[in-house]
Amino acid sequence: MYKLASCCLLFIGFLNPLLSLPLLDSREISFQLSAPHEDARLTPEELERASLLQILPEMLGAERGDILRKADSSTNIFNPRGNLRKFQDFSGQDPNILLSHLLARIWKPYKKRETPDCFWKYCV
């Protein structure tokens, strides 16, 4: 009986930090479904780039979301166009320009070999 009570207290002790985590407001989350037939044709690099394009605006909005909410707390309705305008006013930069700069750093151009006489590690 003593072991059962100590196990329950231990379980509740580990469960308590998980229950104290904040819940996300369902109005702020945008659900995006992608078509499976389109994703099947994309290369891994294109999938990575597409996932960055989807994730980055959400991350930027989460970082500055508290500041923007304090600035305009009168509206509780989610408006993506309005959030883009708020982002432009706050940072002074277009989000598309920021995304293109970040993606340009990731992309590496394909380099051809200088000597066509070499195959794999064997050169003639």
From Swiss-Prot:
Cleavable signal peptide: 1-20
Localization per Swiss-Prot or TrEMBL: Secreted
A Gene Ontology cellular-component term: extracellular region
InterPro entries: Urotensin_II
An example Gene Ontology biological process: blood vessel diameter maintenance
Coiled coil residues, start to end: none
Pfam families reported in the protein's UniProt record: Urotensin_II (PF02083)
Tissue/organ expression: Brain specific.
UniProt keywords, alphabetically: Cleavage on pair of basic residues, Disulfide bond, Hormone, Secreted, Signal
Main localization category: secreted
Disulphide connectivity of cysteines: C118-C123
Domain of life of the native organism: Eukaryota
Keyword field contains Disulfide bond: yes
Molecular function terms, GO-annotated: hormone activity; signaling receptor binding
Propeptide: 21-110
Keyword hit for Secreted: yes
Role description: Highly potent vasoconstrictor.
Family to which the UniProt record says this protein belongs: Belongs to the urotensin-2 family.
Name assigned to this protein: Urotensin-2
Biological source species: Homo sapiens (Human)
Lineage: Eukaryota, Metazoa, Chordata, Craniata, Vertebrata
Gene name as annotated: UTS2
